[in-house]
């Protein structure tokens, strides 16, 4: 199960020790000013978890690539490029409020697909920074 705890993308020094460069799935989420997941309107309802992206891979490596892309302007993670290309998303989810939650697992591709499909069934669309992906249903 993916963690309920969230960690700011910008605060690498406070990323948890258990976040390793091992396979797993992660979600990029928007936080409100109080540091809680920000409710986001979707086609099929309100996403109270504030999910912007669902991804998989060697988690620490993927998140470092995303963090560098966002905060240092380097190329790399597709979610970072999608975020920087969409001012409307930046307006509702400022960079300072981007965070992640994660889980290590043995079959991250399968787990990612499962999480995306659940999201699509619930909200009628993929998370906004996953929009470049083909539908997985």
Language-model regions, residue ranges each:
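A sequence-level detector of short, solvent-exposed, charge-rich linear segments
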Residues: 82, 130, 134-135
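Acidic, metal/cofactor-coordinating or nucleic-acid-engaging core segments within structured domains
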Residues: 60-112, 120-122, 126
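GIY-YIG nuclease catalytic motif and its immediate N-terminal context
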Residues: 1-65, 96-114, 133-137
